[in-house]
Amino acid sequence: MSSASYLTVKALTKYIKRKFDADPHLREVYVKGELSNVKIHQSGHIYFTLKDDGARIAATMFKAAATKLAFEPKEGMQVFIRGDVNVYEGYGTYQLYVQEMQPDGIGSLFVAFNQLKEQLQKEGLFKLDWKQSIPKFPEKIGVLTSTTGAAIRDICTTLKRRYPLAEILIYPTLVQGAQAAPNIVQNIQRANQDATCQVLIVGRGGGSIEDLWAFNEEIVARAIFESRIPIISAVGHETDTTIADYVSDLRAPTPTAAAEMAVPDQMELFQRVLSQKSQIHQMVRSQLMAERQRLNKLQQSYPLSMPERLYRPFTERLAQLESGLQTAMQVDLMKKSAQLQQLHSTVAQHSPKKALAFHQRELEARMQQLTRAATYYVAKQQQQFEATIRTLEALNPLSILTRGFTVAYKDQHMIKSSTEVQEQDYLTLAFHDGKVVAEVKDILPKNEGESL
């Protein structure tokens, strides 16, 4: 038989390994069995045998997966395992590489956990692209946990110690039992409606997987994902991992750690401020020293050591301009003086004094004429006035009283006819020097041709 028909052990082992790698049914398997020959290496890896009544298989759990265990694997423990089967080429044996392991008794919960995790992961709820950043200096922090557990005490104590400027708003929340998941969802939605907090801490203290199961519910995961406020999950201990941890914006191993992640340390901030202050002072001192050296160098430079040379050309130019200005002012003054003299001569030739004297004399003559005319007019008017007075006096009916006539009045009305009176009437007779009251005794009619 030709030697070409024989495979080497290495080639055969590699071929078998490729078969294992290509089989999709061996990439992720769920197996239950009993732990045997458990060895926890100082490197953190765990080596053991998984067996049942009919078979056994070697298994390895590397440190990265082993650190997530919530329990310590022990001899004879019944467990549920998720992992993949592959060939260890060095010994030509196949073995189970364990990714997750849970103790028996919670098998249904473990399966439900993995199914929901796979579903939400496919939907993209775990992607980093959706994670919101935690604010560096939150003013208000919402805490969703039980008010009777140790978690609330640890969170509040840590927040007040590290960053007392932040206000803590507590949303009392059920964290265990059938009503826990709906209550967690309700308080997350309430905190979003209030819109007063910049970050939320959602969690509780440690416990069994049944105790923590509310944080593995789908409604809680979706409420965390839909929250507009960044959420820090703080469920159980460091080895406990829930669906809420995968969906939240930041996962904290413990409630105390969540508080530390939510706020800065005031002492660190203070030290940072002092350090930056010192750096600024040092920078200012260095800058001042550099500027002082630059100033000294400039002061010792040639132009500044003899500054008169800098402005000497300007001084000479200024002297020239000053001399030219004085000359120009003298020439201009002479021109203005000549113009003034010429103007004075012109004014003298056309002096208004003669015209004023002529008009003065004419004005005086006119005044005399007006005076004479006014005197004549007044005298003439006086004569006319006196003639009018005499005429009025002659026509005045009262003036006849001085010649012996009287005027008779009855009831203050002047009597013009004898028909206006009756016998026994009383009449008032007005004389030029007084009045007389008389009684009518008889009325005598006037005969024709008879004079008074």
Swiss-Prot record:
Chief location bin: cytoplasm
EC main group: hydrolase
Function text: Bidirectionally degrades single-stranded DNA into large acid-insoluble oligonucleotides, which are then degraded further into small acid-soluble oligonucleotides.
Protein name from the UniProt record: Exodeoxyribonuclease 7 large subunit
Pfam families: Exonuc_VII_L (PF02601), tRNA_anti_2 (PF13742)
MF-aspect GO terms: exodeoxyribonuclease VII activity; nucleic acid binding
Keywords for this protein: Cytoplasm, Exonuclease, Hydrolase, Nuclease
HAMAP family, sorted: Exonuc_7_L
Record-stated family: Belongs to the XseA family.
InterPro entries cross-referenced by the UniProt entry: Exonuc_VII_L, Exonuc_VII_lsu_C, OB-fold_nuc-bd_dom
NCBIfam families on file: xseA
Origin: domain of life: Bacteria
EC number: 3.1.11.6
Gene source species: Lysinibacillus sphaericus (strain C3-41)
Subcellular localization, as worded in the UniProt entry: Cytoplasm
Subunit structure: Heterooligomer composed of large and small subunits.
Keyword Cytoplasm: yes
